[in-house]
Amino acid sequence: MLSKNVHTADVVIVGAGPVGLFAVFQAGMLEMKCHVVDALDCIGGQCVTLYPDKPIYDIPAYPVITAAKLIEQLKQQVAPFDTVYHLGQQVIGCKIDNDIITITTSAEQVICSKSLIIAAGCGAFKYKRLILDNIEAFENKTVFYSVKDKNKFINKKVVIAGGGDSAIDWTLLLSDVAEVIYLVHRRENFRCAPHSLNQIKQLAEYGKVQMIVPYQLAKLTGENGLLQEVLVTNFNGGTQTLPADYLLAFFGLAADLGPIHKWGLKTDLRRIEVNSITYETTIPGIYAIGDVASYPGKLKLILTGFAEAATAMSHCYQRVFGKKMHFQYSTVKGVLRS
């Protein structure tokens, strides 16, 4: 009889973000016993912890859907299946013996399976913080690195710093509620979708957004953590002082695969190299999908991750049961094994 902290599964999924959840759905459709491990204490990954209100535009059949709503829909999709979740736990150990993959979590849970899928996004993540004098006095009061409630910014003066998709997307989203938005970027060129940048330029013509380029943050002023002004400078020594109630800084994430680095997988710039057909890593039986997976021609889209999840799970099925699955359309509830 197994100890209560020792479990068996057909497949273990590391990561409970959108791609991990869709992998859970695929496992359920194949009637595979599935366990999920995630370091966060809730389901949803970055979608719920970093940008729940952020609009997503590239999910088929949804012209626009917020990150939080997408997770809610995925949770409903996997609800019929008896999935076991180990939340608030990190995978700290992995060993393979006779084709059995055994992982150990930080909560001393042991899970044995024949297949494992890593859907860990960018891994453990930390925001790239601002390096400014006295920044700690303002952080989590009037300086933030993510947005969880856009209503906080109603009729407020907001400075948004950054030149990527996150900065642009939040400028567009908050332009409907903020009094004014100052978009600060150190370069004149932005790293974002051209359509989104064109929308920003239209808002600038109407005065809802002021594009402060090429400038970078230099100094914050205020009292008791309440921001009053943001000083910005350019490379020619020019300065501007921006009145501000809030500052949002979107300079990306510092990602870390954590203990996964020690598994012996081949990695490339904090991502895991996989076979582009099966999404299997350099260790048989271990697969990687979503943003954490790397292969030639990779597109870092949620949609791509969904397709990778379906393919990887089909190969997990073959490994677990020793035969190819009998594919049926997803209109059939619970795909037969063959």
Swiss-Prot record:
Its cofactor is FAD. Its EC number is 1.18.1.2. Homodimer. Disulfide bonds: none annotated. SUPFAM superfamilies: FAD/NAD(P)-binding domain. Belongs to the ferredoxin--NADP reductase type 2 family. Binds 1 FAD per subunit. It holds the Pfam family Pyr_redox_2. One of its GO terms (molecular function) is NADP binding. Keywords: FAD, Flavoprotein, NADP, Oxidoreductase. It comes from Orientia tsutsugamushi (strain Boryong) (Rickettsia tsutsugamushi). It catalyses: 2 reduced [2Fe-2S]-[ferredoxin] + NADP(+) + H(+) = 2 oxidized [2Fe-2S]-[ferredoxin] + NADPH. FAD binds at D38, Q46, Y51, V91, F125, D291, T331. Gene3D superfamilies: FAD/NAD(P)-binding domain (3.50.50.60). This is Ferredoxin--NADP reductase.
